[in-house]
């Protein structure tokens, strides 16, 4: 039976693979039929089952945070986070109380990977390094046990690819690290603030239009302005915006985007650029309309000059804002790379 992995599930799917046939001194295969199958990792008893964690991942993570694991030599598994490397993170969790388990679990998870990466708990049956003898690994633990290891993948796609290559592992459970790091949240809050400013500016410009007086538009605007993160709306919130054939629906769409909680930085950046370009096009359209209206008036020349000034300002802002955000994005990207190097230097090994 081959090992399988089930990503993004609330209930872990556990399956194990039969060990390959052993060979004796006469190069004859030994019968493994009577050999006990690997058991689920130690520490999964009622004694340490704080608040009855729902998944195997939660149970194992509690045990790792509590220090309930055995020493494993780092050289055995060269592309994973071994339990030995996690020992220094577990000392403060030994007096863990049940009511503190969920919070400390999240704090413990932060030590393992960056946001968006996949943490996988596996049981190593055979060494990933072919230069290590199989018997040397079995000597570390009983024959009916496996070595628990945390492995980190850069993305869910990378996890799916790598797990199909590692035929020697028992895949126990996987979980995506939540995006809860301070730097990421800070940058995301800054981008959301910029979007809110654009949203408010457009709202003020459209006070006399039917868009600004739309009840759904006002409800979303006021709700987001009065709360820190904003409520969560489904796609039905965009229905009123679809009834407007022109660019006046942009503020309502921006309001919908602002109320979503699970936005990536790239999505926010794209929305800022798109919103600014759309608002600029709308402003240019309005200026052109104003120019046509005042062609027959005495002040046609001054009206045209003012329109040209407004057009220049809009174009300048359209260029400046994306450039500034691009610089900020790459600064943040370099910062995350630096953080990863620091984590690697503290014996937390990220898989290649």
From Swiss-Prot:
User: GO CC terms for this protein?
Assistant: host cell plasma membrane; membrane
Q: Where in the cell is it found?
A: Host cell membrane
Q: Does the keyword Transferase apply?
A: no
Give the region (Disordered) as residue ranges. Answer: 1-40
Chief location category: host cell
Q: Where is the composition biased (Basic and acidic residues)?
A: 8-21
Topology relative to the membrane: Single-pass membrane protein
Q: Which UniProt keywords apply?
A: Host cell membrane, Host membrane, Membrane, Transmembrane, Transmembrane helix
Composition bias type Low complexity, residue spans = 22-36
Please list every transmembrane segment annotated in the UniProt record, as residue ranges.
Answer: 317-333
Asked if the Swiss-Prot or TrEMBL record annotates the protein with the keyword Protein transport, the reply is: no
Protein name according to UniProt: Uncharacterized protein S9
- What gene is this protein a product of? S9
């Amino acid at each position: 039976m081959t090992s399988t992995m089930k990503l993004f599930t609330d209930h872990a799917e556990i399956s194990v693979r039969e060990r390959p046939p052993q060979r004796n001194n006469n190069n004859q295969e030994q019968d493994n039929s009577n050999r006990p199958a690997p058991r689920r990792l130690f520490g999964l008893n009622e004694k340490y089952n704080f608040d009855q964690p729902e998944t195997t991942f939660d149970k194992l993570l509690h045990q790792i945070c509590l220090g309930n694991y055995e020493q494993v030599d780092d050289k055995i598994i060269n592309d994973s986070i071994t339990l030995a490397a996690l020992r220094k993170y577990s000392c403060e969790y030994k007096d863990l109380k049940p009511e503190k388990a969920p919070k400390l679990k999240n704090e413990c998870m932060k030590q393992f990977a960056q946001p968006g990466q996949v943490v996988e708990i596996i049981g190593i049956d055979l060494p990933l390094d072919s230069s290590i003898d199989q018997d040397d690994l079995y000597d570390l633990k009983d024959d009916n046990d496996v070595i628990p290891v945390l492995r980190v993948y850069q993305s869910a796609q990378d996890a799916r690819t790598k797990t199909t290559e590692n035929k020697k592992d028992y895949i126990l459970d996987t979980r995506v690290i939540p995006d809860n790091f301070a730097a990421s949240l800070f940058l995301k809050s800054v981008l959301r603030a910029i979007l809110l400013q654009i949203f408010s500016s457009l709202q003020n410009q459209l006070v006399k239009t039917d868009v600004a007086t739309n009840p759904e538009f006002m409800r979303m605007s006021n709700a987001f302005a009065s709360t820190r993160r904003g409520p969560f709306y489904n796609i039905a919130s965009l229905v009123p915006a679809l009834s407007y054939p022109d660019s006046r629906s942009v503020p309502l769409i921006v309001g919908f985007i602002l109320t979503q909680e699970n936005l990536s930085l790239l999505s926010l950046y794209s929305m800022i650029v798109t919103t600014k370009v759309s608002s600029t096009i709308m402003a240019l359209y309005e200026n052109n309309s104003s120019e046509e209206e005042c062609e027959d008036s005495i002040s046609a020349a001054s009206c045209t000059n003012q329109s040209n000034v407004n057009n220049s300002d809009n174009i300048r802002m359209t260029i400046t804002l994306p450039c500034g955000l691009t610089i900020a994005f790459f600064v943040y990207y370099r910062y995350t790379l630096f953080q990863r190097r620091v984590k690697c230097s503290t014996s937390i090994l990220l898989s290649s």
